[in-house]
Amino acid sequence: MAMTLSLAACGQKEAPAASSTPAASSSAATSTPVEPVEDDVWSSTDENGNLKLTERDDIGENGMVTTANVYATMAGLEVLEQGGNAVDAAIAISYALGVCEPNASGLGGGGFMNIHMADGREVVIDYREVAPMAQDAYTWLDESGEVKDNGNANHIGGLAVGVPGTVAGLEYALENYASGKLTRQQIMQPAIDMANEGYKAGGTLVGAINDYYDYMVTDYTTLGGYYLNADSMPYEIGDVITNPDLANTLQKIAEGGKDAFYTGEIAQAIVDEVASYGGVLSMEDLASYEPAIREPVKGTYRGYQIVSCPPASSGGTHIVEILNVLENYDIGAMGVNTAETLHVWSEAMKACFADRSAYMADTAFAEVPLTGLTSKDYAKTIYEKITDESQSWNAGEPGAYEGNSTTAYSVADAEGNIVSVTQTIECFWGCKIAIPEYGFIMNDQLHDFDTNPESVNCLEGGKKPLSSMSPTIVLDAEGNAFMSVGSPGGLRIWPTVAQVISNVIDHGMRMQDAIDCARIYERGNADGICWETGGEHEITEDVIAALEAQGHAVTQKGSWDLFFGGCQGILFTDDGIQGGADPRRDGKAIGF
């Protein structure tokens, strides 16, 4: 199962200088480094504090777990070893990631779970956040039509918070797709134990604390109380972080299920704290939340079946759309990260992003031409417009092809069940509001709405903002599980997932090599092609020069840059189940 977190969608702040302002600590939180509980736990960083570029993958015979953090991977593995299935493990991983990767996802967020059961059942559980009923398209705008609070009102503070869906989505999965062999308590116990006993801070988490330190010592000191040390300074790699408040909250959910979170004391604490930062989330908003149960978006690519996430995520739609375009080329013969290949990828990405802006939204509020956008005939029209020169793209006309009729982890078990999940609190540390005495962070998911009141993706009460989350499962021609893949990364999510799929199918790469491979991103703005240095099959200066000669603008990113996501994937082969994890973040795959 592949769980992907939408991170890094927002800009990052400068690293902290020493502050004289102490961070307020929750009465129940323990923020003092202690001796490591387990010294032999694999670390994502080397002795110099740099992310390891190797040791991320593994081979399994009876199952595979790959997540954005080794502690979450171990939580999923523990549940599988106790006899749980891939869905049980996915639930355990989700709660565990909220403990050890709190900057990226957790109880205050939402996501999508893509499930393929060995008996043929398929479903996408959409537990995306929704806008509070009291908000509308003008919520954030001042009299001149600009976003309030210096442009921050839609992603920092109370007006950025959507109704969280994680607990409701996981409860639906537990009730309908879990093995039935394990109780909720057993599935959640690894996360509860981790919050109580502690986990070692990895490089990505430490970087996120440093990047947002200023928030933690000024307006959002409850957040700082949980994620700064006793001296109100950022943790260092290898320090052990505990969160007893979060452990207590998880225990309440383990005992009381969905109602324990959406009604009663936890819900009231959410409403009160969000209101203290100007929000309008209500008890009624929380009590009425239900996940949406959807059919996946489907397509094919060179004989493989693509099964991905439907709206309100745009991701699955555009993965199918761009692969349909690429199918018109012999990508394998064109080579890995050659100028010819990257030019085609760039033009196809621009076309898909133009369609995204024009058509994609919550289908409960807008007509989305889904059949047209995923049609091979429509993709052929895009292919026919691609020339040897870079060009600007406007939205196409997919309606003409309509018939009658949008952190990452993956888990697979011995029975052939496979799950791919993407979940998030949106930007790193969400809206920056932590719930005191309960230990979790609220999302800033409303940031994904367009601030233009005329947009198809404008803010409306009860509406889900457009997402790029793309937990994807690939099946072979006979319908057997072949691959599971997902990634965080905001708008880079679906381009990343599509590139990894192509690396496996077109270039015959192993799962880890497909993830390690250098990536690009192009959405048609002034940055042009964003490209990273480093990585496997490194993009060379000669290739960049050739792209510039074709009229492409280019923007160089860093080496192994987390801008391009943190992909986790599983590949089924005759030699075993391959698990791959992204060295751009703290991910680790473990098989059994």
Please give the residue ranges for each predicted region:
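Active-site rim segments in enzyme catalytic domains, especially the processed small/beta chain
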Residues: 99-124, 280-282, 417-483, 507, ...
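Internal maturation/activation junctions in enzymes
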Residues: 42, 328-425, 437-438, 445, ...
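Extended C-terminal subregions enriched in glycine
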Residues: 415, 463-465, 497, 506-561
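Alpha-helical support elements that line or immediately flank enzyme active sites
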Residues: 79-80, 168-176, 256-263, 268, ...
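Short, small/polar residue-rich loop motifs at catalytic or cofactor-binding pockets
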Residues: 292-293, 403-406, 467-469
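Bacterial signal peptide processing site
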Residues: 11-13
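C-terminal motif of bacterial Sec signal peptides marking the signal peptidase cleavage site
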Residues: 6-9
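Noncatalytic scaffold domains of N-terminal-nucleophile
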Residues: 34-74, 86-87, 91-256, 261-263, ...
